[in-house]
């Protein structure tokens, strides 16, 4: 049974909130962000008939996680984006507490969304349904209803279907928590998208010898890359280490051999996907040209998000830039989308101590004994030395200083700056650090160190959103 539509309230919220958000000095110039309300996980990242689609978790009514819809952008070039109609709203009994994350595939000639319908009960319990919706001729979506109930042996925390086709069959990975409150990744298979069979657990606590791996794994994504398979996911409850897994919840990758017929993923250790303050729920897709592309949410759930100053302007959070994934010598590399060079203005050489803070790209090489400091208008500090990189900033809730680390020899940096974010690509993508910061404007980027650094910079044009 359909629930009362909240579309009129959503339209009113967008009309009232958009001018305020766009006027905010922290609203991004070339990253994707909500016109109002809260954005989180990227969903349904795909390319169909040559056009890219990026859906996203969106609460258009408030800057909190209460009313989860699927927003929708599309693009011909990953630079110029168009707002599409809202794809999903929680207006059925089986998704009444949120249309949670999922993926998109082409099925029976139509773009089809695979998502989790979240249902909460008055006694504090919950359940989850894996659901389908198919695109209509006018670009809206028609819900087909649930296709998979909660599997036996797992709590109501089963979500985020990532679906793909392989060797004539459909496969799906789901994030899950078993009844012993241990995080898992489940593998399902089907001849179509309607009747799924559980193959087994392919990753998580007590799988492949992995102990103490947290109480819930979410946002899984399993895909081939070069001569290996990679599983990306977000374990909740993973133990923090001295300089790793420091966010409330991290995003990780592991490489290994995937046997679809036997339902086995024989993988190695967990690696942090991004070492910055804000990165979560990444999703990948394979473009028509063969590239494996990734986009992530530049946020972390249950962190300092409710203290971000943009909430006062009616919006919160943004996406990362799109990244290209490559597998080289046993390491995952993330490189900035090559199309981003089209946003560059004229190249400018620079060797000095201060720059006006603005949306831009910086690139420079480092010698093995380099020591370097960058201060982002007092809101974020980067330190580079022979041990690696450290990002530092004060908490939004307290004045306590917090740090994030990347360890290794930094030989080259590419730094992408927007009005309230930075993404630092280390050694052509061997490491990445993504973080939000909220400076006062006008602000300065201040360099320090024993040796002046010569670098190239490009001011970045806006990423157009229609």
Curated annotation (Swiss-Prot):
Residues that, per the record, bind substrate: 38-41, 57, 100-101, 159-160, 218
Compartments where located: Cytoplasm
EC number of the protein: 3.2.1.26
Annotated keywords: Carbohydrate metabolism, Cytoplasm, Glycosidase, Hydrolase
Major place of residence: cytoplasm
Catalytic activity: Hydrolysis of terminal non-reducing beta-D-fructofuranoside residues in beta-D-fructofuranosides
InterPro entries reported in the protein's UniProt record: ConA-like_dom_sf, GH32_Enzymes, Glyco_hydro_32, Glyco_hydro_32_AS, Glyco_hydro_32_C, Glyco_hydro_32_N, Glyco_hydro_beta-prop_sf, Suc6P_hydrolase
Source domain of life: Bacteria
The keyword Phosphoprotein appears for this protein: no
Protein's pathway: Glycan biosynthesis; sucrose metabolism
GO MF, one annotated term: beta-fructofuranosidase activity
Biological processes annotated in GO: sucrose metabolic process
Single GO cellular component term: cytoplasm
Disulfide bond sites: none
Family per record: Belongs to the glycosyl hydrolase 32 family.
PANTHER family per record: BETA-FRUCTOSIDASE (PTHR43101:SF1)
Function: Hydrolyzes sucrose and sucrose-6P, but fails to hydrolyze any of the phosphorylated isomers of sucrose and other phospho-D-glucosides, including maltose-6'P and trehalose-6P.
Name the record gives this protein: Sucrose-6-phosphate hydrolase
Organism annotation: Klebsiella pneumoniae
């Amino acid at each position: 049974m359909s629930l009362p539509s909240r579309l009129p309230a959503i339209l009113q919220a967008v009309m009232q909130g958009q001018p305020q958000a766009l006027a905010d000095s922290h609203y991004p110039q070339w990253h994707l962000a909500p016109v109002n309300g809260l954005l989180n996980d990227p969903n349904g990242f795909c390319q169909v008939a040559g056009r890219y689609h990026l859906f996203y978790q969106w609460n258009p009514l408030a800057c909190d996680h209460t009313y989860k819809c699927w927003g929708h952008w599309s693009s011909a070039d990953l630079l110029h984006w168009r707002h599409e109609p809202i794809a999903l709203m929680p207006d059925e009994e089986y998704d009444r507490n949120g249309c949670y994350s999922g993926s998109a595939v082409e099925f029976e000639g139509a773009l089809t969304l695979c998502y989790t319908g979240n249902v909460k009960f008055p006694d504090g319990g919950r359940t989850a349904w894996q659901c389908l919706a198919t695109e209509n001729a006018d670009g809206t979506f028609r819900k087909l209803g649930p296709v998979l109930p909660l599997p036996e042996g797992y709590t109501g925390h089963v979500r985020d279907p990532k679906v793909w086709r392989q060797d004539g069959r459909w496969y799906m990975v789901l994030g899950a928590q078993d009844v012993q409150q241990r995080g898992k990744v489940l593998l399902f298979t089907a001849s179509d998208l309607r009747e799924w069979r559980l193959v087994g657990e392919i990753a998580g606590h007590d799988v492949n010898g992995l102990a103490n791996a947290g109480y819930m794994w979410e946002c899984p994504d399993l895909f081939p890359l070069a001569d290996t398979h990679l599983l990306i996911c977000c374990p909740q409850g993973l133990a923090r280490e001295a300089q790793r897994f420091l966010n409330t919840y991290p995003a990780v990758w592991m490489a290994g051999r995937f046997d679809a017929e036997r339902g086995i993923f024989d993988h190695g250790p967990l690696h942090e996907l991004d070492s910055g303050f804000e990165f979560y729920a990444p999703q990948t897709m394979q473009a028509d040209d063969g590239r494996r592309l990734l986009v992530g949410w530049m946020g972390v759930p249950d962190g300092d998000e409710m203290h971000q100053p943009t909430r006062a302007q009616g919006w919160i959070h943004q996406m990362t830039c799109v990244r290209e994934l490559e597998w080289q010598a046993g390491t995952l590399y993330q490189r900035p989308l090559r199309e981003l060079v089209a946003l560059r203005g004229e190249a400018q050489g620079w060797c000095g101590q201060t720059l006006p803070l603005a949306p831009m790209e910086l690139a420079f090489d480092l010698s093995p004994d380099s020591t370097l400091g960058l201060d982002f208008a007092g809101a974020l500090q980067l330190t580079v030395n022979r041990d690696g990189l450290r990002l530092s900033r004060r908490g939004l809730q307290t004045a306590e200083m917090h740090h994030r680390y990347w360890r290794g020899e930094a030989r080259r940096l590419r730094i992408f700056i927007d009005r309230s974010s930075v993404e630092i690509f280390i050694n052509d993508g061997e490491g990445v650090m993504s973080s939000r910061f909220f400076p006062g404007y006008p602000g300065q980027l201040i360099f320090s160190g024993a040796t002046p650094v010569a670098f190239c910079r490009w001011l970045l044009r806006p990423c157009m959103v229609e």
